[in-house]
Amino acid sequence: MKAGCSMVEKPEGGGGYQFPDWAYKTESSPGSXXIQLWHFILELLQKEEFRHVIAWQQGEYGEFVIKDPDEVARLWGRRKCKPQMNYDKLSRALRYYYNKRILHKTKGKRFTYKFNFNKLVMPNYPFINIRSSGVVPQSAPPVPTASSRFHFPPLDTHSPTSDVQPGRFSASSLTASGQESSNGTDRKAELSXLEDGSAADWRRGVDLMSSRNAVGGGGISHQKRKPDIMLPLFARPGMYPDPHSPFAVSPIPGRGGVLNVPISPALSLTPTIFSYSPSPGLSPFTSSSCFSFNPEEMKHYLHSQACSVFNYHLSPRTFPRYPGLMVPPLQCQMHPEESTQFSIKLQPPPVGRKNRERVESSEESAPVTVPTMAPIPPRIKVEPASEKDAESLRQSAREKEEHTXEEGTVPSRTIEEEKGTIFARPAAPPIWPSVPISTPSEEPLEVTEDIEDRPGKEPSAPEKKEDALMPPKLRLKRRWNDDPEARELSKSGKFLWNGSGPQGLATAAADA
């Protein structure tokens, strides 16, 4: 393919198309690979004699229908010197173009394809042009050329800076782009109005802000260029009679601008150029000469915002946005005494059930206890070395009561703790009850004496729990194997099986 190839007129065409020499070569012999299938299809489409074989689809841009597939395949085979060509092979070649995005099949229509001219028209390709001729059907699509793809409006002649600095915004580009022809004289009048004193100091302020922006935002790579001459889109806020104006009490008189109208608080006061500026130095509302906010003004401003939202159903997102505006705090500062009144107190986390019981019991015993009481040692659960029966426990509790009564303290805490521990972890019923259940004839004193004589016979709480779960026969066997002292007592006849030998054993098994 040649880059700058000449356009060769097809001698027998007459259809108005001009093909580049890479699409059609008159000197190419049959069978040469000088032409591609889509070039050949375009060639058939431009010929009037093949209108019954292949034609443009009516009403669609770039769409064509193959009316006689076998005839198109025969013509393509003759051109490529392949007599065995049929439509199956040709459609496979067309499917290759699907992946290349040159053309695609139209869904729902048989033998209908559509050229993707956006892909075909490439910058380094010469373009296929269509002449206005009666032979070409009206439905045939005009193949786009480079000039028809992009439309750039001509540069504005009224812009004073367009010749020197074409990349910058001009003063006329701030106005509406749709009024180019009708507003030419208005623009000239606006530019002449720029030369008065107010425009001069506006320009000075703009230059000052641009220099500050260049110093402050030097690290930003994509810095937006600022125009040299700029029209203020909105007049500066002055003495407006509108009661809902946010700046009704502003002492600054209004300046002339393009849109000298009372500004609604829901409109953006920042011009469009400033809205997207990367640094707050571009905004004309950041300088100290524009606004001096006092509490009354802020109150009025917030009230007008609320009115605009509630009365006109506006979204709060349409409020004025000032990119770099730092609102000073209100002057009525609170005294430090008042501010320290409302100190935040962090509450401790809620206590659990056991801690709650301890706190309640300590609160009950607090007013009665002596203030010089020794700190209570931490409760540590220890497995008892020698188990006692219920009576010995009661006796020790009574001794503790007497001891605490002598010291002048109430034993309610110890009793509460005893009850709490008993309630929190109920022990399994003892396997060898100290009091006989089934036989009233036996003396209970003798049994208790015998049991008190042997230390460490009653199992601890986890053992009790295990024994309660296992069957009585296995329990008896384990007890018999683990306790040689019990066997000696039973041999000597001192140990009583819950009162009456086998009967007591049977009742114990029945209870379990």
Curated annotation (Swiss-Prot):
Signal peptide: none annotated. Residues 138-196, 341-512 are annotated as: Disordered. It is found in: Nucleus. It comes from the Eukaryota. PROSITE patterns: ETS_DOMAIN_1, ETS_DOMAIN_2, ETS_DOMAIN_3. Transcriptional repressor that contribute to growth arrest during terminal macrophage differentiation by repressing target genes involved in Ras-dependent proliferation. Represses MMP1 promoter activity. The keyword Nuclease does not apply. GO terms for molecular function: DNA-binding transcription factor activity, RNA polymerase II-specific; sequence-specific DNA binding. There is a cross-link at residues 381, 388 (Glycyl lysine isopeptide (Lys-Gly) (interchain with G-Cter in SUMO2)). Belongs to the ETS family. The lineage of its organism: Eukaryota, Metazoa, Chordata, Craniata, Vertebrata. Residues 158-184 have a biased composition (Polar residues). InterPro entries: Ets_dom, ETS_fam, WH-like_DNA-bd_sf, WH_DNA-bd_sf. One of its GO terms (biological process) is cell differentiation. This is ETS translocation variant 3. The gene is ETV3. Residues 35-116 bind DNA.
